[in-house]
């Protein structure tokens, strides 16, 4: 199984991680759809629609399908596009409509099949003890009839789970999960910052450890780990709020809550030194006390 990527507009740290994993770089979007049966979109949520449009445009180029037929041994013209980003079900249906509108002259069959998806859990970690990988769960939904013979292998390799036939279901599951993890982290930042401002953070941490240790561990670990990812979570919080209102029928209450959480992460990413943190190169916010003090100071300076 060949793994390929497009190096356009990626940061140096991301490129270093990709190259370390021996993933092959391709020069253009067209090369990607010519040489790939499956295209997996994993980008910041704000870039999800733009990425889908890039693939759409590449598939519409007049020589894409003929070159793909020459490259692929099967000669199959169809590309399978998975959006695995933390975006609202409404946006997934919009992307599905986009690909459904794709029309290629003299091509009777659909040239692309879209599947909704989401990644639940952290990045893969290799366990030296049992020599197995701990992998995140990749949930997908949408029509799966007629998928190629290589699809079961992809499911097994990536720990994919089909959760339903409808576009949007996988995203709803992903966002419902994230609301309880990243949402809790945003709430923890509000709590820890307030306690720090009043000089009672040590007492708060002590009481969490004594009376609700599991909550305390989740809250402190989340607060420490979030800094390098806060910029990605801004749109994810908004997507959660939208999903709660549109799919959960909360009538605006979901957006009221999670738009506020989005603002928490925006402040972290854009108004504090925590926004400069990089995964694997942490300098600040490695302890919850430092996170709370940085945010408390930033809030004082805003008023």
Where are the predicted features?
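Eukaryotic N-terminal low-complexity, Ser/Thr- and Lys/Arg-rich leader segments
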Residues: 1-3, 20, 57-77, 101-110, ...
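NAD(P)+-binding Rossmann beta1-loop-alpha1 motif at the extreme N-terminus of oxidoreductases
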Residues: 1-41, 61-75
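Conserved beta-strand segments of alpha/beta enzyme cores
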Residues: 4, 24, 80, 113, ...
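Short catalytic-loop micro-motif centered on adjacent basic/acidic residues
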Residues: 41, 81-84, 116
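Beta-loop-alpha module in the N-terminal Rossmann-like domain of NAD(P)-dependent dehydrogenases
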Residues: 43-55, 91-92
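Short glycine-/small-residue-rich Rossmann-like dinucleotide-binding loops
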Residues: 43-44, 86, 240
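Rossmann-fold dinucleotide-binding core
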Residues: 87-182
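Helical "substrate-binding/catalytic lid" subdomain
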Residues: 170-284
């Amino acid at each position: 199984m060949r793994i390929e990527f497009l190096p356009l507009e990626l940061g140096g740290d991301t490129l270093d991680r990709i190259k370390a994993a021996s993933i092959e770089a391709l020069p253009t979007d067209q090369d990607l759809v010519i040489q790939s049966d499956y295209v997996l979109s994993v980008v910041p949520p704000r870039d999800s629609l733009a990425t889908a449009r890039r693939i759409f445009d590449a598939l519409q180029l007049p020589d894409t399908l003929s070159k793909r037929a020459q490259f692929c041994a099967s000669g199959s013209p169809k590309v399978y596009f998975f959006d695995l980003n933390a975006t609202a079900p409404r946006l997934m249906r919009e992307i599905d409509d986009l690909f459904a509108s794709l029309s290629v002259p003299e091509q009777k069959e659909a040239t692309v099949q879209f599947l909704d998806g989401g990644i639940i859990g952290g990045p893969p970690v290799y366990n030296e003890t049992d020599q197995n990988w701990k992998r995140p769960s990749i949930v997908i939904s949408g029509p799966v009839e007629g998928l190629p013979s290589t699809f079961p292998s992809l499911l097994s390799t990536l720990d994919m789970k089909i959760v339903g036939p409808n576009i949007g279901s996988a995203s709803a599951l992903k966002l419902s999960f994230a609301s309880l993890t990243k949402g809790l982290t945003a709430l923890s930042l509000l709590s820890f910052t307030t306690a720090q401002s009043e000089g009672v953070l040590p007492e708060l941490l002590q009481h969490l450890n004594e009376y609700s240790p599991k909550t305390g561990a989740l809250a402190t670990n989340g607060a420490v780990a979030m800094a390098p990812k806060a910029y990605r979570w801004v749109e994810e919080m908004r997507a959660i709020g939208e999903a709660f209102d549109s799919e959960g029928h909360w009538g605006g209450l979901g957006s009221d809550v999670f738009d506020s959480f989005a603002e928490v992460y925006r402040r972290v990413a854009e108004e504090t030194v925590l926004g400069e943190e990089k995964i694997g190169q942490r300098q600040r916010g490695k302890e919850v006390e430092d996170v709370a003090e940085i945010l408390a100071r930033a809030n004082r300076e805003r008023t």
